[in-house]
Amino acid sequence: GIPCGESCVFIPCISSVVGCSCKSKVCYRN
């Protein structure tokens, strides 16, 4: 549920390597 400061509209979350995932076009962690 914590925003990772990254969007995932056109590309996947680069921050997925630290546990972030795409939700509603924004990368979130927990």
Swiss-Prot record:
UniProt modification remark: This is a cyclic peptide.
Residue location of crosslink Cyclopeptide (Gly-Asn): G1-N30
A matching Pfam family: Cyclotide
InterPro entries named in the record: Cyclotide (IPR005535), Cyclotide_bracelet_CS (IPR012323), Cyclotide_sf (IPR036146)
Keyword Disulfide bond assigned: yes
Disulfide bond residue pairs: C4-C20, C8-C22, C13-C27
Keywords linked to the UniProt accession: Disulfide bond, Plant defense
Protein's UniProt keywords contain Disulfide bond: yes
Single GO BP term: defense response
Family listed: Belongs to the cyclotide family. Bracelet subfamily.
Domain description: The presence of a 'disulfide through disulfide knot' structurally defines this protein as a knottin.
Biological role stated in the UniProt entry: Probably participates in a plant defense mechanism.
Protein name, as recorded: Cyclotide vdif-A
Organism from which the protein derives: Viola diffusa
